[in-house]
Swiss-Prot record:
Substrate binds at residues 37, 59-61, 91-100, 217, 235. InterPro entries: Aldolase_TIM (IPR013785), OMPdecase (IPR014732), OMPdecase_AS (IPR018089), OMPdeCOase_dom (IPR001754), RibuloseP-bd_barrel (IPR011060). One of its GO terms (biological process) is 'de novo' UMP biosynthetic process. This is Orotidine 5'-phosphate decarboxylase. Its EC number is 4.1.1.23. It catalyses: orotidine 5'-phosphate + H(+) = UMP + CO2. Pathway: Pyrimidine metabolism; UMP biosynthesis via de novo pathway; UMP from orotate: step 2/2. GO terms for molecular function: orotidine-5'-phosphate decarboxylase activity. Keywords: Decarboxylase, Lyase, Pyrimidine biosynthesis. It is an enzyme of class 4 (lyase). The active site is at K93. It comes from the Eukaryota.
């Protein structure tokens, strides 16, 4: 895992998106990504307004929104990202052949490539998925874009492990500046070959151990000491009975303390 500071990694990173993200993480002293799965734009924007100061990244699933529109959802979301200095990650989990994902990424109702700094993909269809998404981004925007590969998942019984994970890491090596890292539970190596992948970890909870649908939670310390750079927290921030402001600050502090511990530990 990386024991360097976020800023020093930003200075040498091959990806403009990763560099930007690492810099703002240090500036805001946060490695918290808020995962906000809500059904209305109004609810989403209200939560972002509250959590914005505490996060480095916002993870969305815009296809859950009942009232999505480019003008009504994306435009105000981008304004909040600018105001609070965080990036946007649409958790689309692309999983088709190159040409299809290119169209899914750039077209349709959501036009993800136009507004989402980061997206992600499964490795199941091979390296063509990376090439297709990169081409899509280049065709519709001059803004830098980044891709995360899904190497490991936090759900019980996930098939993403062993040879599958290894194959996904090999696919990530096909494009150093577009593939910025992984959704994973552990460090994915690569440093000796010149890669500095960002590891983003879902299934992080300070209070809960899991849910009835197979989600399994791990503690902030556990994931950061294991190599995670960004903790992804969803219901822990805004579930019923929780105050998003209080929880945002709590998770931000816990994540930052764990990161400080990691970079200052004797190596």
């Amino acid at each position: 895992m990386s024991t360097k500071s976020y800023t020093s990694r930003a200075e040498t990173h091959a990806s403009p998106v990763a560099s930007k993200l690492l810099r703002l993480m240090d500036e805001k002293k946060t490695n918290l990504c808020a995962s906000l799965d809500v059904r209305s734009t109004d609810e989403l924007l209200k939560l972002v307004e509250t959590l914005g100061p505490y996060i480095c990244l916002l993870k969305t699933h815009v296809d859950i929104l009942d009232d999505f529109s480019y003008e009504g959802t994306v435009v105000p979301l981008k304004a909040l990202a600018e105001k609070y200095k965080f990036l946007i990650f649409e958790d689309r989990k692309f999983a088709d052949i190159g040409n299809t994902v290119k169209l899914q990424y750039t077209s349709g109702v959501y036009r993800i490539a136009e507004w989402s700094d980061i997206t992600n993909a499964h490795g199941v269809t091979g390296a063509g998925i990376v090439a297709g998404l990169k081409q899509g981004a280049q065709e519709v925007t001059k803004e830098p874009r980044g891709l995360l590969m899904l190497a490991e998942l936090s759900s019980k019984g996930s098939l993403a492990h062993g040879e599958y994970t290894k194959g996904t890491v090999d696919i990530a090596k096909s494009d150093k500046d577009f593939v910025i890292g992984f959704i994973a539970q552990n460090d994915m190596g690569g440093r000796e070959e010149g890669f500095d992948w960002l590891i983003m970890t879902p299934g992080v909870g300070l209070d809960d151990k899991g849910d009835a649908l197979g989600q399994q939670y791990r503690t902030v310390d556990e994931v950061v000491s294991g190599g995670s750079d960004i903790i992804i927290v969803g219901r822990g921030l805004f579930a019923k009975g929780r105050d998003p402001k209080v929880e945002g600050e709590r998770y931000r502090n816990a994540g930052w303390e764990a990161y400080q511990k990691r970079i200052s530990a004797p190596h």
